[in-house]
Amino acid sequence: MTVTPSAATTDGPAAPCAPEDVRRVACVGTGVIGGGWAAHFLARGYDVTAWDPAPDAAVRLRRLIAAAWPALEQLGLAEGASQDRLTVTSTLEEAVADAQFVQESAPEKLDLKRDLLARLDAATPAGTVIASSTSGYPMTDMQTEAADPGRLVVGHPFNPPYLIPLVEVVGGVRTAPAAVDWAARFYAVAGKSVITMEREVPGFIANRLQEALWREALHMVANGEATVAEIDASITEGPGLRWAVMGPMLTFALAGGEGGMAHMLDHFGPSLTSPWTRLEAPELDRALYDAVVAGCEEAADGRSIADLVAERDRGVIDVLRATGRLPRSAEEAAR
């Protein structure tokens, strides 16, 4: 899924090859996220060079990839995919010397990110797109020291990158629109589900939604209103099952019955001011009302409420079955 246009506003050099022609990927930073990226790229048939300053990085990386490989085999390996196509280098410069795409996954420290992206920019072949896995920093704040900021983009994954399809792509104010578009196309070719964001916002989309839930959960624990186990169960046994099939907006639209989101907002919109959360609620004005209703209609893509309900129900059953929580039939229970 892609939302366009990008937030980037300046022009810059194009990448040296088409996204479909990329064969060599560099992963800089090989912790949980960077190592997960390396596993994903290897499973998609790329040659991967990797570098991390930690003395035991190579051992930990190979162990992570080996542990992830059975799951990747179940997902389906690309032709030629092999763990043997990994090369761990002793320097950053070696890792990116002939890279056609670079994925940076260093720790979340702004000064570190700025310095590292500047080093990568200096060492990577001209025009090659460099993406950061940052989970929250806008690229505008990270690209300040780079000589060629036009090729720097955010490519934010979800953990583990080799299993969770989502990657959020967005540029900074000095990123070239062509670089954002190229990165989005490359990730799609590499098997990811891409959201190209219109504008920068700290935390991007999914992390901001997660953070809202996380903060409310912490409030409830701190106030003795719910235990950690109760909070987790409330999601895994409740809305989490629906969210695995369709997102929260379309799920709420179904709660409106045949009237969809418009009916939902008309009847439940006033509850936004109820003390159900410690987050301040937005004003449900006509612009927000219309945007939410129209967005749900677009997401439905012509499917009726009945069609969506059936799709949701099938998906929830599949999730329950996959997680071993599908209630047994009477015959099975009697055995």
UniProtKB/Swiss-Prot annotation:
Compartments reported by the entry: Cytoplasm
GO molecular function, one term: NAD+ binding
Key words, A-Z: Cytoplasm, NAD, Oxidoreductase
Pathway(s) the chain acts in: Amine and polyamine metabolism; carnitine metabolism
Gene Ontology CC annotation, any one: cytoplasm
Cysteine disulfide links: none
EC number: 1.1.1.108
Chemical reaction(s) catalysed: carnitine + NAD(+) = 3-dehydrocarnitine + NADH + H(+)
InterPro entries: 3-OHacyl-CoA_DH_NAD-bd, 3HC_DH_C, 6-PGluconate_DH-like_C_sf, 6PGD_dom2, L-carnitine_dehydrogenase, NAD(P)-bd_dom_sf
Residues bound to NAD(+): G29, T30, G31, V32, I33, G34
GO biological process: carnitine metabolic process; catabolic process; fatty acid metabolic process
A UniProt-annotated Pfam family: 3HCDH
PANTHER family in the cross-refs: 3-HYDROXYACYL-COA DEHYDROGENASE FAMILY PROTEIN, 3-HYDROXYBUTYRYL-COA DEHYDROGENASE
Purpose: Catalyzes the NAD(+)-dependent oxidation of L-carnitine to 3-dehydrocarnitine.
Quaternary organization: Homodimer.
Family: Belongs to the 3-hydroxyacyl-CoA dehydrogenase family. L-carnitine dehydrogenase subfamily.
Protein known as: L-carnitine dehydrogenase
Species in which this protein is naturally found: Streptomyces griseus subsp. griseus (strain JCM 4626 / CBS 651.72 / NBRC 13350 / KCC S-0626 / ISP 5235)
